[in-house]
């Protein structure tokens, strides 16, 4: 279940309160437990996956979550599978660990592992959101954010796209608030 770290050090774990904090940004978070993970538990704990296994996971997931694609106009999706042995892991981390925006929305449903997203709120304050298994996150286009793996370096999520080129980061130059990283 998601948790939100506010700039003043407050940690919020109530999903309704997290949603309220993120609402001014248009960021949407919801926790869904469709039960699909019981259909492929061995694949969720496995680091490397074949293309066939990835397609199997996405197909099973989409059979339950087709409404997400229809409601939001997502054109396609894929499975993001990051683990300590992932090729180009450090490049992936460096690409998204700086504040950026996208011209298209960023949306994902977490299957396993966890990731941290940082946001700049309209008042200039910064918050960090930890998403975990069964959390669905939708970030509208133009919202300033960054994301990073946690220390486990392990994350599996179905990513949803509205543009053929996916999520291209446009860096903003905003500095991460060090007080959130203590």
Curated annotation (Swiss-Prot):
Annotated residues for binding of Ni(2+): 100, 102, 106, 145
The record's free-text note on cofactor binding: Binds 1 Fe(2+) cation per monomer. Binds 1 nickel ion per monomer.
GO molecular function: acireductone dioxygenase (Ni2+-requiring) activity; acireductone dioxygenase [iron(II)-requiring] activity; iron ion binding; nickel cation binding
The protein's enzyme class: oxidoreductase
Gene3D superfamilies per UniProt: Jelly Rolls (2.60.120.10)
CDD domains: cupin_ARD
Reaction(s) the record says it catalyses: 1,2-dihydroxy-5-(methylsulfanyl)pent-1-en-3-one + O2 = 3-(methylsulfanyl)propanoate + CO + formate + 2 H(+); 1,2-dihydroxy-5-(methylsulfanyl)pent-1-en-3-one + O2 = 4-methylsulfanyl-2-oxobutanoate + formate + 2 H(+)
InterPro entries documented for this protein: ARD, ARD_bac, RmlC-like_jellyroll, RmlC_Cupin_sf
Cofactor(s) annotated in UniProt: Fe(2+); Ni(2+)
Binding residues for Fe(2+): 100, 102, 106, 145
A Pfam family of this chain: ARD
Assigned EC number: 1.13.11.54, 1.13.11.53
A GO BP entry: L-methionine salvage from S-adenosylmethionine
Top-level division of the source organism's lineage: Bacteria
Keyword Lipid biosynthesis: no
Regions annotated as coiled coil: none
Keywords for the protein's UniProt record, in alphabetical order: Amino-acid biosynthesis, Dioxygenase, Iron, Metal-binding, Methionine biosynthesis, Nickel, Oxidoreductase
Record's keyword annotation contains NADP: no
Pathway(s) annotated for this protein in UniProt: Amino-acid biosynthesis; L-methionine biosynthesis via salvage pathway; L-methionine from S-methyl-5-thio-alpha-D-ribose 1-phosphate: step 5/6
Function: Catalyzes 2 different reactions between oxygen and the acireductone 1,2-dihydroxy-3-keto-5-methylthiopentene (DHK-MTPene) depending upon the metal bound in the active site. Fe-containing acireductone dioxygenase (Fe-ARD) produces formate and 2-keto-4-methylthiobutyrate (KMTB), the alpha-ketoacid precursor of methionine in the methionine recycle pathway. Ni-containing acireductone dioxygenase (Ni-ARD) produces methylthiopropionate, carbon monoxide and formate, and does not lie on the methionine recycle pathway.
Quaternary structure note: Monomer.
Similarity annotation: Belongs to the acireductone dioxygenase (ARD) family.
Alphabetized HAMAP family for the sequence: Salvage_MtnD
Protein name according to UniProt: Acireductone dioxygenase
Gene name for this UniProt entry: mtnD
């Amino acid at each position: 279940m998601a948790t939100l770290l506010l700039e003043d050090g407050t940690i919020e774990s109530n999903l309704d309160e997290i949603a309220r904090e993120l609402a001014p940004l248009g960021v949407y978070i919801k926790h869904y437990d469709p039960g699909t993970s019981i259909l492929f538990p061995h694949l969720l704990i496995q680091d490397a996956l074949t293309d066939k296994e990835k397609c199997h996971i996405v197909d099973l997931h989409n059979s339950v979550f087709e409404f997400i694609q229809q409601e939001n106009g997502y054109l396609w999706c894929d499975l993001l599978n990051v683990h300590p042995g992932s090729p180009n892991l450090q490049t992936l981390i460096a690409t998204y660990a700086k504040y950026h925006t996208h011209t298209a929305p960023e949306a994902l449903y977490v299957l396993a592992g966890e990731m941290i997203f940082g946001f700049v709120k309209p008042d200039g304050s910064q918050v960090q959101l930890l998403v975990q298994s069964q959390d669905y996150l939708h970030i509208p286009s133009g919202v300033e954010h960054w994301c990073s793996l946690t220390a486990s370096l392990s994350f599996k999520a179905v990513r949803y796209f509205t543009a053929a080129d996916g999520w291209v980061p446009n860096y903003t130059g905003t500095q991460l608030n060090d007080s959130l990283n203590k």
